[in-house]
Design a protein with these regions (language model features):
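Phosphate/nucleotide-donor binding subsite
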Residues: 124-173
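Glycine-rich phosphate/nucleotide-binding loop
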Residues: 190-219, 299-303, 307-412
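Glycine-rich phosphate-binding loop
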Residues: 28, 167-186, 266, 271-353
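Short, glycine-rich nucleotide/cofactor-binding loops
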Residues: 74-87, 224-234, 375-382
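N-terminal phosphate-binding or glycine-rich loops at protein starts, especially the Walker A/P-loop
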Residues: 28, 49-115
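Composition-driven recognition of long, low-complexity, acid-poor segments enriched in small hydrophobic
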Residues: 6-47
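Glycine-rich phosphate/diphosphate-binding loop of Rossmann-like nucleotide-binding domains
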Residues: 86-88, 100-105, 226-292, 301, ...
Length: 412
């Protein structure tokens, strides 16, 4: 299953960079090889009881009757973005309104949205949310398809993702969410919201579970930038440090550089030069190189890498949950003994699935633009939408943008 679809055109739009990923591909192969051992450690740890888990906390919810309307934040939603939009996106938004202190500005083609609401039996819930002032429908033009080039954001100025970004720019929403074409989402965010001063390239940051239930790791970049300079990775570390500190409540995030060895002398030219920058950065707690097997170890709070390597890692980890469950089921004895064993393990298996299922984590933040932007999976269903909206709400309510603004000091 593909989490983030990226058009190569977005790199051309933003910086005119040429694509040359040969060295990154070699490094990605080493990373994928070593991360397998880390996955085994996670497999054994997920059977342990859960303590405080930011991922679990992000996945939780609140009864609608307990939510004070004064606490609700406006989030703009690209209702036409995604493989299955607008139906599952609308369903997830209505569910999120009942569970989270937020209000939705749902952007899309009104006729298609209303038709989807009717076909899914959501018409009454939709009208109720509108009457309560918890959901607004905002009209847009034709959407940008999942297979369109990122340049479409310039041709289709009234596309749903552009309209949603404009709501954030005008202060009518505090965050934006889209499960659409990630290249187009990134391009729209850059053109509409602009980059933070001092940040050359925005990065997509995704949360991965680790063997410690209370310590997810933020990995960035996982697909926005195929070719990186050392300064880009240095900036990714600064962005990730603030997110980890503000949203995940890590007092002193441990920053790791994804590499093929722990020693300072290991890696390609990008790794060696980035290591020097991170080592000398006083604003960071640089914990050194992070091998692939250590990404899920819980020893790092933030791991930085180029988008090519990060996306390879991301796609590999997508398969871990289903593979582990398949292995466990295959190893259970058949017959009566197997049924008894399955009964005892049922709750554990459900917990494993929940912790490793990408749908439970919803989406990833696009860090480095002048606004909170969350990119969801192209295949997002209602559960993924709720989880992604929770991430957007958490980032907005924890003052992430205020702290990110401090990175701009001295950049005028």
């Amino acid at each position: 299953m593909i989490w983030y679809r990226r058009n190569a055109a977005v790199t051309t739009i933003v910086d005119g960079a040429a694509s040359s990923a040969t060295a990154a591909g070699s490094m990605a192969g080493n990373v994928a090889e070593t991360v397998v051992s880390g996955a085994g450690t996670v497999a054994s740890s997920v059977l342990q009881p859960l303590g405080f888990d930011p991922l679990r906390w992000l996945q939780g919810g609140t009864d609608a009757d307990e939510i004070d309307d004064a606490e609700r934040l406006w989030v703009a939603v690209d209702g036409m973005g995604g493989d299955h939009a607008p139906g599952p996106i609308l369903e997830g938004c209505l569910d999120a309104i009942d569970r989270l202190p937020l209000k939705i500005r749902f952007v899309g083609e009104i006729d298609r949205v209303m038709a989807a609401a009717t076909s899914l039996g959501l018409r009454e819930a939709l009208e109720s949310a509108r009457a309560a002032g918890h959901l607004d429908l905002v009209a847009s033009g034709p959407s940008i398809g999942m297979d369109d080039e990122a340049t479409a954001v310039r041709r289709k100025r009234d596309a749903s993702i552009n309209v949603a970004m404009d709501l954030v720019k005008k202060g009518e929403a505090e965050a934006v969410y889209s499960a659409g074409n990630s290249g187009a989402v990134m391009a729209s965010a850059i053109f509409r919201l602009g980059r933070l001063k001092g940040i050359d390239r925005p990065a997509i940051g995704a949360l991965f579970p680790t063997k410690d239930p209370g310590k997810p790791v933020l990995v960035l970049d996982v697909g926005a930038n195929m070719d990186c300079k050392p300064t880009y990775l240095h900036q990714f570390a600064l962005l990730g440090n603030i997110y980890s500190r503000d949203v995940l409540q890590v007092k002193r995030p441990r920053i790791g550089l994804l590499n093929i060895g722990e020693e300072e002398c290991k890696g390609n030219d990008l790794s060696l030069k980035t290591h020097e920058l991170l080592r000398d950065e006083s604003r960071l707690h640089f914990a050194g190189n992070c091998e692939g097997r250590d990404v899920l170890s819980g020893d790092f709070d933030v791991v930085v890498c180029d988008g090519f390597t990060g996306n390879v890692l991301l796609k590999f980890l997508e398969s871990v949950g289903s593979v582990l469950l398949g292995v466990l089921r295959a190893e259970l004895p058949r017959g009566r003994r197997g049924k008894v064993g399955s009964a005892f393990l049922r709750s554990n298996l459900k917990r494993i699935k929940k912790r490793l299922d990408h749908a439970e984590h919803g989406g990833a933040l696009l860090l480095g633009v002048n606004g909170i932007s969350v990119i969801g999976h192209g295949s997002s269903k209602a559960l993924s939408v709720v989880s992604a909206l929770r991430i957007a709400h958490s980032a907005a309510s924890h003052g992430v943008m205020e702290d990110l603004a401090t990175l701009q000091q001295g950049c005028d």
